[in-house]
């Protein structure tokens, strides 16, 4: 079984210098992946360590993930957990996909980080693969989804300044959208009354929010200062709401008529998730700029912002940059991830298994709506039990997320099968029954 090394500094290759001054590789001792038993800690002691030293912004699942493979995570006791959250849409080619792991480890042996002064092979090969696959001209590498969106916002604003003047910076985004947690992407997120924006002082100005899937509302927000419209093809954090065909086509037409840029945030939907390599390809609508991350790296941190030549040329030396962006190991892993998704037609699998998943979810008790595209699916209940359903499923070693009180979201690796769905549905039925009984008991008691 393939195993990752615990940390980048613990490589399986040692180096020595020969008489000619060159560096020759010699085999080193393999280091095991870190296991709980190797630390001398108990499970509870490790959890206490996390709680003591780490900032608490995440609701933890109550188990230690020691390793992962395919559709499963394994805890410190070797017990399997069926993965229907995929690291939040990251592990699309499967947890610890062998090709992605091999590409990263092989690249570590050659070169890891250089900054962006010299040319590197992984950067070049990945850039060509991405641009030719999705029909865009240029790529700017980043390290995460929020950085990719920051890049997209900056590029749009720079385009507005260069072509129309410094007042052309206004961007319209969607209510209940989500674009990230750094200041530009946070301001673009149409959730002003939630913890995402509350308590952080004034938001970056220049954003207005319109109702998702309401073309007239978006059109009404356009002013003389507007330069772009920015949306997600499927609102993930907003409850899993896909854009309608009419809405997407209408936004493209509106942008063309008003001289605006269309920005698509495909951090979650990109690379096969919705049934096509990029979600916009399924709509037949091309953006001026698109962001991506998550599945792109197949488990390694990487993001990117892709644009047309006309828009991309506003970025010149000094206008944007990043120390780690385009990291050789991340690019090598991303090339393997994208290749796996394309060569194995995981987009097609997402369409087929996604249809089956929605069909089976709709048969469950208390389900009033099932929506989504491909393997990005939301299941909404007629009572507020989503969080408790998630907890009950965790007890049965099946993982998925909750959005608010009433929606569970399924975003598994794109290698999921109908058999995996059947296992999920069995557990969800039991979990819904338990959660609903608790809710009704509590309601009667209250």
Predicted regions and their residues:
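Conserved N-terminal phosphate-binding loop of PLP-dependent enzymes in the Aspartate aminotransferase
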Residues: 34-446
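Short, Lys/Arg-enriched N-terminal segments with co-localized hydrophobic residues
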Residues: 8-33
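Extreme N-terminal basic, low-complexity initiation segments
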Residues: 3-7
């Amino acid at each position: 079984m393939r195993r990752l090394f615990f940390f980048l500094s613990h490589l399986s290759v040692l180096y020595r210098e020969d008489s000619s001054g060159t560096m020759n590789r010699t085999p080193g001792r393999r280091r095991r992946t870190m296991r709980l038993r190797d630390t001398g800690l108990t499970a509870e002691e490790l959890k206490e360590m996390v709680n003591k030293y780490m900032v608490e912004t995440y609701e933890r699942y109550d188990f230690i993930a020691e390793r992962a493979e395919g559709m499963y995570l394994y805890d410190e006791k070797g017990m399997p957990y069926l993965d229907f959250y995929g690291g939040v849409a990251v592990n699309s080619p499967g947890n610890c996909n062998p090709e992605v792991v091999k590409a990263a480890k092989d690249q570590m042996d050659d070169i890891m980080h250089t900054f962006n002064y010299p040319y590197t092979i992984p950067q070049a090969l990945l850039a060509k693969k991405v641009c030719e696959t999705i029909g865009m001209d240029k790529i700017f590498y980043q390290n995460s989804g929020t950085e990719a969106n920051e890049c997209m916002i900056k590029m749009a604003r720079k385009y507005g300044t260069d072509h129309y003047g410094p007042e052309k910076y206004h961007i319209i985004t969607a209510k209940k959208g989500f674009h990230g947690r750094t200041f530009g992407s946070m301001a673009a997120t149409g959730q002003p009354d939630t913890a995402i924006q509350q308590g952080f002082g004034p938001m970056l100005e220049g954003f207005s929010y319109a109702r998702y899937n309401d073309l007239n509302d978006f059109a009404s927000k356009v002013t003389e200062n507007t330069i772009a419209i920015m949306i997600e093809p499927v609102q993930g954090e907003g409850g899993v709401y896909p854009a309608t065909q009419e809405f997407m086509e209408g936004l493209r037409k509106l942008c063309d008529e008003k001289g605006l840029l269309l920005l698509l945030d495909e951090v979650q939907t990109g690379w096969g998730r919705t049934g096509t390599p990029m979600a916009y390809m399924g709509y037949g609508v091309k953006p001026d700029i698109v962001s991506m991350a998550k599945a792109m790296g197949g488990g390694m941190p990487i993001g990117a912002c892709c644009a047309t030549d006309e828009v991309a040329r506003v970025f010149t030396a000094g206008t944007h940059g990043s120390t780690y962006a385009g990291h050789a190991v991340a690019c090598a892993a991303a090339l393997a991830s994208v290749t796996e998704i394309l060569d194995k037609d995981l987009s097609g699998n997402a369409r087929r298994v996604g249809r089956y998943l929605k069909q089976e979810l709709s048969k469950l008790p208390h389900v009033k709506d099932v929506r989504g595209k491909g393997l990005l699916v939301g299941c909404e209940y007629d009572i507020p039990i989503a969080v408790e359903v998630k907890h009950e499923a965790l007890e049965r070693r099946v993982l998925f997320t909750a959005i608010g009180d009433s929606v569970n979201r399924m975003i598994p690796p794109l290698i999921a099968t109908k058999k995996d769905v059947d296992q999920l549905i069995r557990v969800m039925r039991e979990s819904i029954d338990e959660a609903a009984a608790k809710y009704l008991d509590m309601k009667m008691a209250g």
